[in-house]
């Protein structure tokens, strides 16, 4: 059962990251004509399209997509418990709380990976990659304020490193507040 749980958890996590990327692309007003953005939109549109007709947006927040990401996180735990318990599960409010925690952790994990890929691409492609352009649009609102406080030293931008440290601190802080379950999400 561990192999099945791993596979299902990974598939859920990957799709949750794609849905969170869609939310982030909209919030950052990133280039939607970019090939990477088009992939994200096409991968989520079959579900998000009908949901957006039912659930309206609130300001810049696409509530339908946020709700869908949350439901996916809750559903992930329900399915994993079903597998672990051989098909019997009683729904609990704990699933709702775990879903929220999982969504928060997935967003932080996605930020980490986007920052890491952006840093690597900045050394390799030097601005010629369409993915790098979108990742720059996504992360620049977080890097720019840090860059005002800590300017580049010798041409080396430390804002991404500061964000990495901040993300790790937040991760360990959540582990201290919530307990060991945070690291198992």
Swiss-Prot record:
The lineage of its organism: Bacteria, Pseudomonadati, Pseudomonadota, Gammaproteobacteria, Vibrionales. The chain crosses the membrane at residues 5-25, 63-83, 97-117, 149-169. This is Uncharacterized protein in proC 3'region. InterPro entries: CCB3/YggT. Belongs to the YggT family. It comes from the Bacteria. It is a multi-pass membrane protein. It is found in: Cell membrane. Pfam families: YGGT. Keywords: Cell membrane, Membrane, Transmembrane, Transmembrane helix. GO terms for cellular component: plasma membrane.
